[in-house]
Amino acid sequence: VQPEEYLVKYAADRVRTTSLVWMGATLGCAECHDHKYDPYTMQDFYRFAAFFSDIQQQGNGNPEGNLNVPTKEQNKLLAQHEEMIETLKSRIEEAEDPEKVKLVEEVQRLTENQNVLHKMIRQTISPVSDEPRITRVLERGDWMDQSGEVVLPGVPGFMGRSLSENRRLSRKDLARWLVSRDHPQTARVWVNRLWRLFFGRGLSPILDDTGLQGGWPTHPALLDWLAVELIESGWDVKHMVRLMVISRTYRQTSNPLAETELSDPGNRWFSRQSRFRIEAELIRDNALALSGLLVKTIGGNSIKPYQPEGYYSYLNFPKRVYQTSSGVSQYKRGLYMHWQRTFLHPMLLAFDAPSREQCVAQRPI
């Protein structure tokens, strides 16, 4: 695989993931041609991809931290050391032996302390290059054809207000647009997925496609109201959860009622509470809870529950050794389970957990 091909693959993955997660959109389908069902064009796809064109692509593992994030106390100590060093250096120029020797030694000591302080400062990664790469529309998605139109970062043209300004747009502009009141999808997509967690199905049945291939919401006015409530609450998820679970709809019995069996056999209109399957992690958690083994400790490292010996022997790129967690920590909630992408823990695989090769909003359970 050529480096340029990797760049195209990474860009396409970012477009697919970002558009699906936040917009419930299949913008990734417009990589090689205009979208067949929704009004996304190839130009929309590559303009969206251009938001990520200033990310440094190492291609050889995680880069080292390159941005210091000192605490207030560390900043204060560093400033004090710098001031003392500069003061001593000015005195060295006028001093004579043996005082000069003592001053030089003191400067060396303070400099060593300063270096130690710098090593104690936490670092984060600023994966932004100085010069964004040129982004072109690739005919049929062919990375070898560099004759296409050069595009700048931008959002899909049909989605209302443009972000055009007298400068190159950044990912911060994209983020602000995604959570703005003007955005037609983000809040609706979010509350629809939250609704599914408590009612078994979304107000719109397809969680990862809000286009023509998705499902029309059964209660569009309710979906709009919840979306506005989410925005006006300051995107307060706890508020939305509370709102849903104290509703009369949520507190209904899941037992079928004679009067609704014929009018709403599939519970499409939420005439009763749903009975729905739970995810693989929750099946494990429930089994551990029933046996009295579940550890409810919050936080900490990921865990590696028992799995058959040699299970990883078929895993390539690179070979890995699985070391089962010891003690009660292996019984922590499924939230903390180690995930080996494309090679799931057997228990997760048995109950249809996703492989995480691609972003999934709705599991096939």
Located regions from the model:
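Primarily short, surface-exposed interaction patches in extracytoplasmic proteins
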Residues: 8-11, 39, 76-329, 348, ...
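Active-site Gly/Thr loop motif
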Residues: 333, 340-352
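A broadly conserved detector of short glycine/acidic/proline-rich loop/turn motifs that flank catalytic sites
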Residues: 52, 141, 294, 339-341
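Hydrophobic alpha-helical segments
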Residues: 55-58, 342, 354
